[in-house]
């Protein structure tokens, strides 16, 4: 399986301080859909047909682009002679015109949208629009897993409280699929260090989240990716999954809106190893790409001494250690191991 993030633009109609892109301050460029399709065709010819392409439309905000361009790329993705999946990440703070609504509900396998503490909703009207759009899509799709809510783990979000978050966001909007992502300090987050939690705060939060889920018996009702990544390690001995999967630089491509190519979308505007005009062979053998793969593969020395390495695998290499240690929720993992 290859994950392919296609950035339709580098800009957005919002300014979230945690965002790994740069919000409305991002470059005012839009994708060249013919070059995107040509690149996908090259990749399709190069890779084995039994390898699935999981394609996600990203930005900035994908739906500030022309709908005819979105439909053209969707047509091309579905025309490939292999198994494909097409989804989108979108802020849902815009009018759901009939053509947008049709594209989302008829052409995509699902969408991811975010709810965050600071900057995400600048007015009460924006929040109400977001909630209204979610309900509209839910009513049409009748699929509880179609919409995934993602929230970035910032200091303000931690202070907001788990119970309040579930009551005011998850339960209120009938959400059944969600994730809480660890913050990586890229893009706008570089300019806002006050929102970055310590790694101990991250570990403590996920332990408390697990306790909340256990107390309210929520695992049967809501899929929470960040916890499922941990649970399946213990229950199914499946170690390489989610953010603990240290092969992102090998199995992931991000096509920036200006036509440059990277891997991890969090650092895609700067960690570039080629362009869509390059051959796939040239991209794969790029010294910069090989260096990024090497960076991801090599663990900090301390990891090799840890008794949980087999479960953690070192974690996402974009998550740096601080004076409080790493971000892996060790207390939670140890308790789950002891219960098996």
What are these regions (language model features)?
Residues 1-35:
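Canonical Radical SAM [4Fe-4S] cluster-binding loop centered on the CxxxCxxC motif
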Residues 4, 25, 37-56, 65-198:
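Radical SAM/AdoMet-radical enzyme domain recognition
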Residues 8-15, 61, 303-305, 309-310:
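Cysteine-centered iron-sulfur cluster-binding motifs in ferredoxin-type domains/subunits
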Residues 12, 16, 57, 259:
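Conserved, mostly hydrophobic/aromatic
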Residues 42-59, 326-340:
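Short Fe-S-cluster ligation motifs
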Residues 60-62, 92, 251:
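Active-site metal-binding loops of divalent metal-dependent hydrolases
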Residues 186-270, 309-311:
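A C-terminal junction/extension of Radical SAM enzymes
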Residues 260, 266-340:
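Flexible mid-to-C-terminal extensions adjoining Fe-S/redox cofactors in radical SAM and related proteins
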């Amino acid at each position: 399986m290859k994950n392919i993030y296609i950035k339709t633009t580098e800009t957005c109609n919002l300014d979230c301080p945690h965002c790994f892109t740069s919000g409305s301050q991002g470059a005012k460029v839009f994708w060249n859909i013919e070059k995107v399709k040509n690149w996908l065709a090259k990749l399709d010819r190069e890779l084995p047909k039994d390898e699935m392409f999981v394609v996600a439309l990203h930005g900035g905000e994908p739906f500030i682009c022309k709908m005819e361009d979105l439909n053209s790329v969707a047509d091309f993705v579905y025309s490939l002679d292999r198994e494909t999946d097409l989804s989108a990440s979108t802020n849902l703070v815009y009018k759901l015109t009939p053509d947008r609504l049709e594209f989302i509900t008829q052409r995509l396998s699902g969408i991811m949208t975010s709810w965050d503490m600071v900057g995400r909703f600048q007015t009460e009207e924006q929040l109400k629009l977001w909630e209204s759009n979610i309900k509209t899509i839910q009513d049409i799709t009748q699929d509880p897993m179609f919409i995934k809510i993602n929230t970035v783990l910032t200091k303000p979000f931690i202070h907001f409280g788990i119970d309040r978050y579930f009551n005011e966001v998850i339960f209120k909007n009938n959400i059944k699929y969600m994730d809480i992502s660890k913050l990586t300090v890229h893009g706008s987050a570089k300019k806002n260090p006050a929102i970055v939690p310590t790694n101990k705060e991250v570990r403590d939060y996920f332990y408390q989240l697990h306790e909340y889920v256990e107390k309210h018996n929520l695992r049967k009702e809501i899929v929470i990716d960040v916890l499922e990544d941990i649970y399946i390690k213990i229950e199914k001995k499946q170690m390489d999954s989610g953010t603990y999967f240290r092969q992102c630089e090998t199995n992931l491509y991000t096509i920036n809106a200006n036509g440059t190519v990277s891997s991890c979308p969090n650092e895609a505007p700067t960690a570039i190893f080629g362009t869509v005009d390059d051959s796939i062979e040239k991209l794969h053998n790029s010294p910069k790409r090989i260096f990024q793969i090497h960076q991801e593969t090599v663990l900090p020395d301390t990891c090799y001494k840890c008794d949980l390495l087999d479960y953690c695998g070192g974690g996402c290499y974009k998550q740096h250690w601080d004076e409080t240690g790493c971000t892996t929720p060790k207390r939670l993992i140890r308790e789950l191991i002891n219960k098996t």
